[in-house]
Amino acid sequence: NTRTRKNLVRFFSDELASSGSNSDAKPVESMESIRASYGLFQHQMKAVNDLENRFTENSRLLLHMPTGSGKTRTAMSFLARYLSKRQTVVIWLAHNEELCEQAYSEFSRAWQAQGNRTLTSQRYWGQHEAHYTSLSDGLLVAGIQKFFGRIRDDSQAIYQLGERASLIIMDEAHQAIAPTYQSVLELLTILNSKDSRLLGLSATPGRTWNNFDEDRKLSEFFDRQKVTLTVDGYDNPVDYLT
């Protein structure tokens, strides 16, 4: 009835008035910014997306990003995405121990932030001896000189590993056209011919800026397929970095 409605209106009006008059009440936070623990800049995210898209049609790609643009971080984000979608083996090759350790540590940070399961990461350079014959899901970071030596001593072990590896990453990709390194890369990619990808990382387009023959060899080795750094609003991405 009318009296009941009036009493209800009065009751709730009094409640609202009393709750709004509490000047000591602390404001309630309704939103917050959540920072990514392994975030990327826009140009790095674009490069990762480009790699994913281009690998659907190509088996070899060269990622060319100038020094200071986050080449390793970009490659690790791509690698984390790649491993998140499949159980497989990835081999990361570098020509010195410093680059190997950098890659190993960086992958650990990337996978802890972006990974979706527990997997294995193994060292194989210097004094490290990896048990990669049992590796079926994870990353092997290897010094290419040691890797090449193992091929000569125990080629069967390398064959078994190569058959399980679906992605080979070569840091400092301009080294890839050296005869020793090239033979290792060719062997690993041939062993898993049905599902094998090769990614080279480079801060410079070739061994030198003016050696056309070396640039041509590098381009041909990666099937003339290259992903480069692009930054909106800059014709030359180096200008963005300086």
Task: List where the protein language model places each region.
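N-terminal accessory nucleic-acid engagement/regulatory domains that precede
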Residues: 1-29
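Conserved pre-motif I regulatory segment
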Residues: 19-64
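Conserved Walker A/P-loop ATP-binding site and its immediately adjacent core
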Residues: 69-77, 82-109
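Loop/turn-to-beta-strand initiation segments
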Residues: 88-89, 135-139, 164-167, 194-199
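A short beta-strand-to-loop transition that corresponds to the Sensor-1 phosphate-sensing loop
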Residues: 96, 142-146, 201-205
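Inter-Walker segment of RecA-like/P-loop motor cores
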Residues: 112-152
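Conserved RecA-like ASCE ATPase "motif II neighborhood" in helicase/translocase motors
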Residues: 139-169, 176-184
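Post-DEXD/H (motif II) to motif III coupling segment of the RecA-like Helicase ATP-binding lobe
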Residues: 175-242
